[in-house]
Design a protein with these regions (language model features):
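N-terminal carbohydrate-binding/catalytic regions of secreted carbohydrate-active enzymes
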Residues: 44-106, 110-117
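Alpha-helical transmembrane segments of integral membrane proteins
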Residues: 340-545
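Substrate-binding cleft of secreted/luminal carbohydrate-active enzymes
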Residues: 243-306
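Aromatic- and acid-rich polysaccharide-binding/catalytic face
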Residues: 98, 104, 134, 172-210, ...
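Substrate-binding surface in catalytic domains of secreted glycosidases
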Residues: 143-163, 182-222, 240
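Substrate-binding cleft of extracellular glycoside hydrolase catalytic domains
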Residues: 55, 91-167
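Aromatic-lined carbohydrate-recognition surfaces of secreted/lumenal glycan-active proteins
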Residues: 106, 160-178, 225-232, 268-278
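Active-site clefts of carbohydrate-active enzymes
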Residues: 194-202, 221-252
Length: 545
């Protein structure tokens, strides 16, 4: 029987570790980076809320747009819009009531009929609201997307320019102004996008201001005497790294504050991207596409304009959840195995944190019903795996022994039976569920890793999805419970694909991308157990039928 004082000490150590593990990455930072003004020049304004999307023609109500404009009016002089045809509201009219100026845009794509409708509405709005519309933007990144040839774009610009009194411009990434300088002769303002995160050679936040300065001066030299506006500039608050360009709330605050200071030094005419996180953008751009807002999707400011910034303001709740889950896991284990002591307490602490981390990295990013279902299934699977691991560890530490390991063939057979609604496959499930569920996570990891290899640009590294499986590998290693031998083609295929894809991803990603390097290491850790079973073949009983 373990000494109570040892168990209590282990629980206290686990609690202390939990608090430190959640506080350290969320400690106040960037307090020394000052914001030199409390009001921006302009911000991109898309008033879509969760569940709304221009891709599905689900628009906000006029009342919601009014509320959003009233909110941003406290922080900005102007707003930029991207389409002239939206819902049953006119942004320029509402903006005028709140004293805001508008950079009014028309969306141009491959549909020529729709393009003419956009241009007609743009012209009508600009002429109807000259007190609000201070410039018009004919198309956004049309050349980048290759939606129209440059001659058609120029024709659209000329069409609008002949019909409105405001300055006319076109907006695109700065490289495309270099590639198509002839467009400059048809606009009143050169509107460039500078997004260091999305550059072909991404830049860490500490290197971005020098880049912004250099690009701006290059555009001045290329188009002497022409006014230049920065139509989009910003930094994402979450998502996958690109080399050392790391999305985070702290980095976003640092970028915005330093850019505002630079803009005052150099006299930039600029527009920040963007007012609100746009959940619908994840469909095309992943998590990072939905995370450029200065406000969250539920209209909360992400960071103060001055003073320290906390990466995740909700961290105390997740730390508390980790402690509760750890106590629940240990309590349930102690009830079933009265001899459970300090080692089970430490394992429960690790699993509680893993589950809380999985929730933190999953629930806030469940942007639609499909992601919500995926997150729910994953969290349920990780919760079950954590409970089964506690049971297995307690049995091993008690000297009672655990069920003999199952191989991938048996696990695959169980999954196949369940997909065919053969519920008898779950008879005596406690004896094999841990191995079978672990193998399901292995297959999922292999599939996701292949997707990361062939289509990585918008995919997150799935640390939260495999938090408990990673703890399970570490725990089984310490318990000397990793099986050797008995593996078959399933282990070779799943483990081999995962390992090879992880190595290939690490090679393709830049070494500065520590997030990618860390995930590749985690993927290799997950791949080790099945590959170990290939070292020495042992006969394994066929799965029950």
């Amino acid at each position: 029987m373990p000494k109570p004082i040892t168990t209590i000490a282990a629980l206290l150590a686990a609690a202390l570790f939990t608090l430190l593990a959640w506080w350290w990455p969320n400690r106040p930072q960037a307090g020394d980076v000052a914001m030199v003004t409390q009001r921006f020049n302009s911000v991109s304004f898309a008033p879509f809320r969760p569940g709304q999307s221009p891709l599905r023609d689900i628009f906000p109500t006029a009342q919601q747009v009014e509320e959003d404009i009233a909110l941003v009016a406290r922080r900005t002089r102007a707003i930029r819009t991207y389409a002239s045809i939206e819902g049953d509201y006119e942004v320029a009219e509402i903006a005028a009531r709140h004293g805001l100026r508008v950079w009014k845009g028309a969306w141009l794509g491959q549909d020529r009929v729709r393009n003419q409708q956009e241009l007609a509405r743009l012209i009508a709005t600009a002429n109807a609201h000259p007190e609000a519309v201070e410039r018009v933007i004919v198309g956004n990144e049309v050349l980048l997307r290759r939606d129209l040839p440059v001659n058609e774009l120029i024709a659209a610009i000329d069409q609008v320019k002949a019909a409105v009194r405001q300055p006319v411009t076109y907006a695109d990434v700065w490289e495309f102004w270099v590639q198509f300088p002839e467009v400059a002769d048809h606009v009143d303002v050169i509107t460039i996008h500078i997004l260091p995160y999305w550059e072909d050679e991404p830049l860490g936040v500490e290197r971005t201001m020098a880049h912004v300065r250099d690009v701006y001066r290059r555009m001045q030299a290329l188009f002497p005497g022409k006014p230049i506006a920065i139509g989009e500039i910003g930094w994402p608050s979450r998502g996958r790294w690109r080399e050392d360009a790391a999305p985070s709330r702290v980095n976003q605050a640092v970028f915005i504050r330093e850019f505002i200071q630079l803009s005052q030094e150099m006299g930039f005419d600029y527009n920040l991207i963007e007012a609100f996180d746009q959940v619908w953008k994840y469909k095309n751009e992943g998590t990072v596409g939905a995370a450029w807002g200065l406000w969250t999707a539920d209209r909360q400011e992400k960071f103060p304009l001055s003073g320290p910034v906390v990466e995740n303001p909700d961290w105390p709740w997740y730390a508390g959840l980790a402690l509760l889950l750890a106590l629940a896991l240990f309590g349930a284990t102690r009830a079933a195995f009265p001899g459970a002591g300090w080692r089970e307490a430490l394992l429960a602490g690790a699993l509680g944190n893993a589950l809380a981390y999985a929730a933190c990295g999953g629930i806030p990013y469940a942007f639609d019903e499909h992601l919500t279902l995926a997150v729910a299934v994953n969290l349920a699977g990780q919760g079950l795996l954590a409970a089964l691991l506690m049971r297995r560890a307690a049995m091993i530490l008690a000297g009672a022994g655990a069920a003999p390991p199952r191989d991938g063939r048996a696990a695959t057979a169980t999954v196949r039976d369940l997909l065919l609604f053969r519920w008898r496959a779950l008879r005596d499930w406690r004896g094999f569920a841990f191995d079978d569920l672990s193998f399901v996570f292995l297959w999922v990891a292999a599939v996701l890793q292949v997707m990361l290899l062939v289509d990585p640009r918008y995919r997150d590294f799935p640390y939260p999805t495999f938090a408990v499986p990673l703890v399970a590998v570490a725990a089984r290693t310490l318990l000397r419970d990793l099986p050797r031998g008995g593996g078959g083609r399933e282990e070779l295929l799943a483990g081999g694909v995962l390992a090879l894809a992880a190595i290939a991803s690490a090679v393709l990603e830049h070494p500065r991308n520590l997030q990618a390097m860390g995930w590749s290491l985690c993927a290799l850790v997950l791949a080790v157990p099945p590959l170990l079973r290939m070292l020495r073949r042992q006969p394994v009983p066929a799965p029950a039928t």
